[in-house]
């Protein structure tokens, strides 16, 4: 089976968030037994890991968007995946000068790329075309209008239903969509407005989200009734599939960045397991200038944005200071009031012996924190899937979370973590934190049971890939 994915980011080459990681993991697992290709835009200024000698083939691709255009397809293989980068030769201003993946003109840029991607897929053929998020929503309509050779199914995965790709009718008129297919993207209440996600929902054969609970939650999203109508119309062809994580890379037994390696097997002797965690904690505290004592360590490894619950993060800081345990927050935070507030907190707590805020991100440091921490706090307002709770469990770090989306699917209160429900109740959140801290301090038997359940949790890439294959083959 030939499976072609298209998106605007792919972690080994370029990424801005979880979409790139999720696509990489899925494609890697599918490539073991199937011909798998990923088609993304070429961002010359942003690629850092790609060298010209890696490219094994090029071809010219004519496409239509705001007139007759031409693209060049560059391809190479990465871990069994054919990666194709499309360079829009006739419209170089759209991607070649981009300093970031996302800009102020994303709808037009991504529609131009989608037109080129659809033309490439029509030429190359595919059994399954798998689209990722609204950015490539136009591909669905173009391939329905003019299917590629041997096309059996178009699958759309919603990594974040909150982003939808609102744009003008004029942008879609620049493509070769006829009036019938263009109407799938239009809003009835405002025919001059189109929504790339809306059209993709109607033009795809099957829709998935990245967790079962999130699939249920989006059916209750009434923020735009026309988008609600579109997702409701597809509810019998909608399924939530939990993302997997790469256990070959995320493995505390072999992770080269840890001060002390350890494994699930080591937990047969809990004392030895926790001693290994303690060695990692000691090394991390020395790096961050924290005071080492017997108090628990909680971490937050997350973008600091509205979705991630910044007000709860601030409550966690207060709770840590009041209850004398360590809290480490690491994550990027871009502009606005949230950035200002957390920058002030970072500065005011710079000399705190037990709270550290790092407004940056390092994969190496993140793994060292996973290995050292006793708990990871994830107080998201919504969370389509979430990977950090699964990585935490892999490293024997107990998740304390809000029960939403993929967090609700992976963390059971009192079994393999702790959870709260109300997205507006600080009291419930603080009670959950107190319960987790008290369990660690006062009930070691219960704590060991919870850590054991974390280590026994499994959500690997192969399991997720097999569920997608079931959809492909239906």
From Swiss-Prot:
GO terms, molecular function: alpha-1,4-glucan glucosyltransferase (ADP-glucose donor) activity; alpha-1,4-glucan glucosyltransferase (UDP-glucose donor) activity
Enzyme Commission designation: 2.4.1.21
Involved pathway(s): Glycan biosynthesis; glycogen biosynthesis
Keywords, comma-separated and alphabetical: Glycogen biosynthesis, Glycosyltransferase, Transferase
Enzymatic class: transferase
Binding locations of ADP-alpha-D-glucose: 15
Reactions listed under catalytic activity: [(1->4)-alpha-D-glucosyl](n) + ADP-alpha-D-glucose = [(1->4)-alpha-D-glucosyl](n+1) + ADP + H(+)
Pfam family, one: Glycos_transf_1
InterPro entries for the chain: Glyco_trans_1, GS/SS, Starch_synth_cat_dom
Keyword Glycosyltransferase: yes
Gene3D superfamilies for the chain: Glycogen Phosphorylase B
Keyword Kinase attached: no
GO biological process annotation, one example: glycogen biosynthetic process
Sequence similarity: Belongs to the glycosyltransferase 1 family. Bacterial/plant glycogen synthase subfamily.
Function: Synthesizes alpha-1,4-glucan chains using ADP-glucose.
NCBIfam families (UniProt xref): glgA, PRK00654.2-3
HAMAP family membership: Glycogen_synth
Protein name: Glycogen synthase
């Amino acid at each position: 089976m030939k499976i072609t994915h298209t998106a605007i980011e792919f972690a080994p080459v370029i990424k801005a968030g979880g979409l790139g990681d999720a696509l990489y993991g899925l494609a890697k697992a599918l490539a073991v037994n199937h011909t798998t290709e990923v088609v993304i835009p070429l961002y010359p200024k942003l690629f850092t890991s790609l060298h010209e000698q890696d490219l094994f083939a090029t071809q010219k691709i004519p496409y239509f968007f705001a007139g007759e255009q031409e693209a060049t397809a560059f391809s190479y293989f990465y871990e069994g995946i054919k990666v194709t980068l499309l360079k829009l030769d006739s419209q170089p201003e759209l991607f070649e000068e981009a300093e970031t993946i996302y800009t102020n003109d994303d709808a037009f840029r991504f529609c131009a790329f989608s037109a080129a991607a659809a033309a490439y897929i029509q030429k190359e053929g595919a059994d399954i075309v798998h689209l990722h998020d609204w950015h490539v929503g136009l591909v669905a309509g173009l391939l329905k209008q003019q299917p590629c050779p041997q096309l059996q199914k178009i699958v759309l995965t919603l990594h974040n239903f909150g982003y939808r790709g609102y744009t003008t009718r004029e942008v879609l008129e620049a493509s070769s969509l006829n009036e019938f297919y263009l109407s799938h993207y239009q809003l009835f209440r405002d025919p001059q407005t189109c929504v790339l996600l809306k059209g993709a929902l109607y033009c795809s054969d099957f829709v998935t989200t990245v967790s079962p609970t999130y699939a249920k939650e989006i059916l209750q999203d009434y923020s735009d009734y026309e988008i609600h109508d579109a997702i409701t119309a597809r509810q019998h062809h909608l399924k939530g599939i939990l993302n997997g994580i790469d256990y070959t890379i995320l493995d505390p037994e072999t992770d080269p960045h840890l001060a002390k390696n350890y494994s699930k097997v080591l937990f047969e002797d809990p004392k030895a397991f926790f001693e290994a965690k303690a060695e990692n904690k000691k090394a991390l505290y020395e790096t961050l200038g924290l005071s080492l004592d017997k108090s628990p360590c909680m971490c937050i490894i997350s973008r600091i944005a509205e979705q991630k619950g910044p007000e709860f993060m601030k409550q966690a800081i207060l709770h840590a200071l009041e209850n004398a345990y360590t809290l480490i927050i690491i994550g990027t935070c871009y502009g606005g009031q949230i950035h200002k507030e957390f920058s002030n907190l970072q500065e005011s707590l710079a000399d705190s012996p037990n709270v550290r805020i790092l407004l940056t991100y390092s994969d190496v440091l993140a793994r060292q924190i996973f290995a050292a921490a006793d708990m990871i706090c994830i107080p998201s307002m919504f969370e389509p899937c979430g990977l950090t709770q699964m990585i935490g469990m892999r490293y024997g770090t107990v998740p304390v979370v809000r029960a939403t989306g993929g967090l609700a699917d992976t963390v059971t209160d009192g079994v393999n973590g702790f959870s709260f429900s109300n997205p507006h109740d600080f009291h419930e959140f603080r009670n959950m934190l107190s319960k987790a801290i008290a369990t660690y301090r006062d009930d070691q038997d219960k704590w060991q049971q919870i850590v054991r359940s974390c280590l026994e949790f499994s959500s690997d890439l192969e399991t997720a890939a097999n569920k997608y294959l079931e959809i492909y083959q239906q």
